[in-house]
Amino acid sequence: MAWLRLQPLTSAFLHFGLVTFVLFLNGLRAEAGGSGDVPSTGQNNESCSGSSDCKEGVILPIWYPENPSLGDKIARVIVYFVALIYMFLGVSIIADRFMASIEVITSQEREVTIKKPNGETSTTTIRVWNETVSNLTLMALGSSAPEILLSLIEVCGHGFIAGDLGPSTIVGSAAFNMFIIIGICVYVIPDGETRKIKHLRVFFITAAWSIFAYIWLYMILAVFSPGVVQVWEGLLTLFFFPVCVLLAWVADKRLLFYKYMHKKYRTDKHRGIIIETEGDHPKGIEMDGKMMNSHFLDGNLVPLEGKEVDESRREMIRILKDLKQKHPEKDLDQLVEMANYYALSHQQKSRAFYRIQATRMMTGAGNILKKHAAEQAKKASSMSEVHTDEPEDFISKVFFDPCSYQCLENCGAVLLTVVRKGGDMSKTMYVDYKTEDGSANAGADYEFTEGTVVLKPGETQKEFSVGIIDDDIFEEDEHFFVRLSNVRIEEEQPEEGMPPAIFNSLPLPRAVLASPCVATVTILDDDHAGIFTFECDTIHVSESIGVMEVKVLRTSGARGTVIVPFRTVEGTAKGGGEDFEDTYGELEFKNDETVKTIRVKIVDEEEYERQENFFIALGEPKWMERGISALLLSPDVTDRKLTMEEEEAKRIAEMGKPVLGEHPKLEVIIEESYEFKTTVDKLIKKTNLALVVGTHSWRDQFMEAITVSAAGDEDEDESGEERLPSCFDYVMHFLTVFWKVLFACVPPTEYCHGWACFAVSILIIGMLTAIIGDLASHFGCTIGLKDSVTAVVFVAFGTSVPDTFASKAAALQDVYADASIGNVTGSNAVNVFLGIGLAWSVAAIYWALQGQEFHVSAGTLAFSVTLFTIFAFVCISVLLYRRRPHLGGELGGPRGCKLATTWLFVSLWLLYILFATLEAYCYIKGF
């Protein structure tokens, strides 16, 4: 019973080897002339036993002599078999380039304007290609290109005569995908974990079409016109492909009847199979991974693309917050790199990415994500080590620092500072200055001043003063200007003995005026207690500011001590530490003090988009003057009659008392952090997988082709550090280095947005597929296997191995099962509609133009199609049954259920291979 403990994949390979061995012995027996005890089924011996007479291939000729000895035959079988494996490796590697071009093509983005429920609009970028459409067209073509092209090349290369290799490969590949790949995906999920299909509507559509595709094949072969494919049958088969894509897109976008059906699908509760629910639904139930009615907010339609963009931003913000908590010692750049690798590793990936990853890890090209992370780290470290040594600047810059000055009217004089920066500090420099009137007038408010500032060798700054005139007249704040001009350097004389030519060749030191070369001086009146105000009525602050500082200005006077109360007032932003800390208190302005600062703590919520407001309000200022002015302004004085002198004094006191100015209330608008928003946007752009799998130049491709890298898993660590290559990596690299270097000549994916790489790659895949078809046919005829059996067993297996590893990786790494098994059904349907539909349409049209019919043998293919359709019904039914609550999803679940499902699917595949082989050799009767 020890064999029961073998893993399903190992068991599948074991059975595969046994079947191959039996078929090989059968071929040798047939070649040796043994008649055997083959039951009579009404078919001739050649049809039942297969033929050892090899035919000319599309590219490869026949290997002569045609009837070799047993030893030579075994040698030829080994050569053909090894050549097949090597060609399969080559196809996998060029398919890697092909899928990279598809990833780049489907990652193209365009700008859209999204209208929010509140009427605001925002511009963002979304992908041009719909995910469902790309999966059923380019992605399916990329993963199934060898099968599709083999069918087309076989028909066209053999004079438009139907062959068994192409169609049987498509059906055999569909069986391998449906049973073996899904079985492996079910098993590899850790015990107790599950994976569900997210886009269930799309899965229903593609599953239905995949079943219909093979039913349709049977109807063409055995019902409508047995043994003949007419033109309308071929064209209609091909036409089903865009119809399938269109219906899947309608289901994904919820168009037509989906738009009016706020439903989910559900079978009877008593049967327990909860697929989706219909009718009324509780709040928060998901359909296809999206909230029900989530696209209707306040009666307005919000595009689903906008919601997906917002979801991406929220996920990126969550990653940044988590990493910041785990690694508080890291700076922002380090956190960005870590978040980039984490997001790339954990985001939902396309089928193309998993196919590329599987091929590269299998051929010693390494883990794409780890290589990308290592390259980014090296690039960052090299950038930090670059020090640009700028040549010495011979130009000296002269300017005011600072450029704005304030002084009280009674200060006497104001000092201004001139600064020299750069150039030759050993020279003496001169710069002229002159005052200019603004609202303040020379002679009345300040003293007109002009002169020259001398900066001696080694001096970097110099001060000069301008006199301020004081008066007892109450007036507004006034200002004037001071302008620099005519900067020059003292002329230098040549040293004794220095030739004039050498002296004249030396660079002359230069000096220029730099901004700011004009200073503004504001004179504050000191004959008034002051007008208290904010600088403006609205201020925008970033949520990451921490503690914001707001200035309260005292203008039009600064006499006496004044207390100004203040407090924060809630708006849409809430206090109490939710959005900001409640702040209140009093500002005490001393005599001649003109500026005070209010500090308010802002809570950083790290939101991508934020706009909330609160207010800071100033109360009535209180004059702390204890003279006659304060006495006359007190409420007690109003009870008695004032004398003429007191009335005049009170009028003057009223004019000079402190009051609130133009902006007594400040609105503070809290916005998202620009740096944080930019970081999130940058991360979203950097986490585009097209940047990881794509190439930018031929140099990059050749360097990658000759480099050995470690294959490791993404789950090993979060740092993204590369490991050293293993022995297996080196072996696979040297086995495939010829293909890698050859296919490095394919145009990089950056050219023509990936289309150049797409076109060249598909041409190369077609050439290699033609060779594979010839090798497979010659391999089969050498050992006496029929083309239909060779296709179902060998060719289908060889073309599906990369997809197997890709689906396994997708099942383990993705949250949902769409990338691992959701694309299997769609790919199977596309194989029939494109692979068989295109080939048969071309052949049917060709023979129709010749006035003849296109004949296709219905027997073996019709039997295989019928058998696969029955088994596919069983497989899909089991997958839907696994959505019961106690199992939870198509993949994973309890260990016993996993094993049972996997064994069932593997057994279905083995039965399919067995029955198809027995029917081909007439051991059982087909159609």
Swiss-Prot record:
Tissue expression as described in the entry: Isoform 2 is expressed in brain and skeletal muscle. Isoform 3 is expressed in excitable cells of brain, retina and skeletal muscle. Isoform 4 is expressed in skeletal muscle.
Binding site for Ca(2+) 5: 543, 607, 672
Annotated Alpha- repeat ranges: 140-180, 796-832
Annotated transmembrane regions: 74-94, 148-168, 170-190, 203-223, 231-251, 727-747, 755-775, 779-799, 829-849, 861-881, 904-924
Keyword field contains Calcium: yes
UniProt GO MF annotations: calcium:monoatomic cation antiporter activity involved in regulation of postsynaptic cytosolic calcium ion concentration; calcium:sodium antiporter activity; calmodulin binding; metal ion binding
Family: Belongs to the Ca(2+):cation antiporter (CaCA) (TC 2.A.19) family. SLC8 subfamily.
Function, in words: Mediates the electrogenic exchange of Ca(2+) against Na(+) ions across the cell membrane, and thereby contributes to the regulation of cytoplasmic Ca(2+) levels and Ca(2+)-dependent cellular processes. Contributes to cellular Ca(2+) homeostasis in excitable cells, both in muscle and in brain. In a first phase, voltage-gated channels mediate the rapid increase of cytoplasmic Ca(2+) levels due to release of Ca(2+) stores from the endoplasmic reticulum. SLC8A3 mediates the export of Ca(2+) from the cell during the next phase, so that cytoplasmic Ca(2+) levels rapidly return to baseline.
Name of this protein: Sodium/calcium exchanger 3
UniProt organism field: Homo sapiens (Human)
Top-level taxonomy: Eukaryota, Metazoa, Chordata, Craniata, Vertebrata
Gene name per UniProt: SLC8A3
